[in-house]
Amino acid sequence: WEKFNQRYTRRIRSVVKREVKKFRDCGDLKKGYRLFVCEGCHDVKKVAFRCKGKFCPTCATGESQRWAEVAANDLFTVTHRHVIFTIDEGLREIFLKEKYRKELLKGLMDEAARILLDFFRKHHIQAGVVATLHTFGSQLEYNPHVHLVVTMGGLTKDGKWKDYDYFPFAMLRKYWQNAVLKLIRRPLSQWDKARVQPLLQAAYTKNAEGFYVHAPKRSRTSLKKILEYISRYMKRGPIALNRILLYDGKIVMFQYHDKRTNTDKIKTMSAEEFIGAL
């Protein structure tokens, strides 16, 4: 990390440096601790303060589990569906621009939730949605996409529950595509709009059926399981320690699941590339 930080310090966001420092200091007695003394035998035990950071695999695991439990208790015990909204690969670099990143990434969540809620409103139903943003894929590549947990039904104007278990995928995909392309242009300067226009046009032409939206008919697992899956990416770092197979000081080898082929694969990167991906 020291070499990486020294080499790319101007490009590393302050929040990243802060999280890494918290993680490296986590559990260090020199940074502070709680002292427990047994009143009977007077045995003394020091428990170091934890960082509670997202980047820390120890702290983030507990935070992830707690979030899933709290969220599950807050949601109605009705049928839910896990929906994933993705964007064209050629557009990802636009969401990396520091000048627009925050607005564009928040906009992705807002637009995905709006499209689903508008669909149910047309059927006179107020549905419930939990939206979370994920900015990376299983290979640690930058891949902003939105995960949503949506009720399969909702409340009518008179407060009664009405089931509705149907999604018109063709419509959702085109609506989502149009929403993303408009979202990208919204905050950009005229110069930046002209620069990214070829990317927008290519993404539109390449995806004649719209951007990919994945929503299994019904989840085969419980609502809590869906939330646990989502929270792993929202409350934890990009990769779990058990996926790292090898580190020799120079290279990192880790395992990932290829959803296209439904198989586990291995990827090898230099230590510098790995830190940069994180």
Go through each PLM region and give its residues:
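Beta->alpha loop/short-helix hinge microenvironment recognizer with preference
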Residues: W1-L278
